[in-house]
């Protein structure tokens, strides 16, 4: 086990004591109370882990002292020797739990998310695959009790989507879906294939934390806002009013388009929320890319050009290339809930990378 510096743990305990005293004092203003309460709720879990770790440390030290005591009671020494493996295991578990609690937190993890799926190479088959991916994430969200709301969609000519953008609302959505960003590849025999040949198609997935107004400031003077009639499949107009909204953020060139609502006002609000999330994500990505380059991270880099996963239908196989994980349960993964097995493995690998970067591996 890599030792955890005692002075670091003492500093956390001291901060917890200080914040508790500040809240008990009652002299802080309302805004400070909110911030202190939030900090205290985060510290409570870490402090409990520190105390558990130190209790496990003390217990093992006591057992070792009994075993090593010269002239000690043989019966007590034998009993201590029996208890030692269990005490060592308990300390190792407490050490691991505390290490994870001490890892740098991603402030966006608690947020809802924006999910974007775009068909890539492969024509109609790519659009169908994009639709399959969207249904997989929708079913996964349902299994978690999250809510999915489509912001914009462009359907494929034979089904699926050329592009679909949706909000996934719920607690800690981003913490689970953030590793899905990247290029997804499918290998299967299309329904239209008469020779039984396997085709390869692709779709790209982007997952952004849903930003709030406090997360990023947008100057209205930087926006170019266009209104137009909403369009359906094939480009035909589906209503006579100009309810669709396209917003361009001039300094960055980021463009968002929303037409799902019949009301122009509602579409504008949704477009602004989407723009906010895109700009917030761009800021985060720039910072994360620098950190990822420093630690040569394989997971969580958020590189959307990277091929991250292959879905091979003839073999019933899902392979995540970042961690060399292969599961022969493609149907279960596409059905939603079994996606947890892939995400859990990615989270574990990401934590290992963070531990190494922090010198705690």
Curated annotation (Swiss-Prot):
Q: Where in the cell is it found?
A: Cytoplasm
Chief subcellular location: cytoplasm
**Can you name a GO cellular component term?**
cytoplasm
Q: Which residue ranges are recorded for the region named Disordered?
A: 285-313
Q: Which GO terms describe its molecular function?
A: translation release factor activity, codon specific
Q: SUPFAM superfamilies, alphabetically?
A: Release factor
PTM comment: the record says: Methylated by PrmC. Methylation increases the termination efficiency of RF1.
Give a yes or no for keyword Cytoplasm in this entry.
yes
Q: Which UniProt keywords apply?
A: Cytoplasm, Methylation, Protein biosynthesis
Q: Which residues are annotated as modified residue N5-methylglutamine in the UniProt record?
A: 236
- Please name the PROSITE patterns in this protein's record: RF_PROK_I
This molecule's function is given as:
Peptide chain release factor 1 directs the termination of translation in response to the peptide chain termination codons UAG and UAA.
Family named by the database record: Belongs to the prokaryotic/mitochondrial release factor family.
Name of the protein this chain belongs to: Peptide chain release factor 1
Organism equals Methylorubrum populi (strain ATCC BAA-705 / NCIMB 13946 / BJ001)
Specify the taxonomic lineage.
Bacteria, Pseudomonadati, Pseudomonadota, Alphaproteobacteria, Hyphomicrobiales
Name of the gene: prfA
